[in-house]
A protein has these predicted regions:
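Aromatic-rich carbohydrate-binding modules that target alpha-glucans
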Residues: 1-49, 58-80, 129-130
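Tandem-repeat/low-complexity and Cys-motif detector
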Residues: 31, 84-88, 115
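Exposed beta-strand face motif in extracellular beta-rich ectodomains
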Residues: 50-52, 95
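Helix-coil boundary and N-terminal low-complexity module in membrane systems
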Residues: 54-56
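Structured interaction patches on ligand/partner-binding surfaces of diverse proteins
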Residues: 61-110
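Non-cytosolic coordination micro-motifs
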Residues: 114-115, 122
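Short, low-complexity, Pro/Ser/Thr/Gly-rich segments in the mature regions of secreted, periplasmic
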Residues: 120-129
Length: 130
């Protein structure tokens, strides 16, 4: 996809913005960088240690496909107990959010859709304090 969408809680579009709480209609777009499978966006993270998820389809559409965390490094501190959730940093501030899907993904048709990596490399999620 050309963009993926982050939603969850304990973040906002700006420091003075309304804290988000799992509202797909106000999801943060992470835009694809060139021809890579890296997606980036910037948001403000509060210190409440929230969780997020990434939607791979239109966040307000009828079918919402979330990125499973099973294809990320199992030792990563960003993984959450929920199979599609990731933990936010606990230091408050603006962050660049970067998701690297390595060789890309394939999303199957049908209910439920299955997300499959196009290669064997583990995906990465990075938070860079700005």
């Amino acid at each position: 996809p050309d963009a993926i969408y982050m939603y969850g809680w304990s973040w906002a579009h700006s420091a003075s913005g309304t804290a988000q709480s799992w509202q797909p209609e106000s999801a943060l777009p992470l835009v694809r960088v060139g021809d890579s499978f890296v997606y980036e966006g910037t948001c403000y993270v509060f210190s409440w240690a929230g969780d997020i998820a990434f939607i791979l389809t239109n966040p307000t559409g009828n079918t919402k496909v979330e990125l499973p965390n099973e294809n990320f490094d199992a030792n990563s501190s960003v993984l959450s107990g929920n199979p599609t959730h990731f933990s936010l940093p606990t230091t408050e501030g603006y962050y660049k959010i970067s998701v690297d899907l390595k060789e890309g993904i394939t999303i199957s048709e049908g209910e439920p859709s299955i997300v499959t990596p196009n290669g064997s490399s583990k995906f990465t999620l990075r938070y860079t304090l700005q």
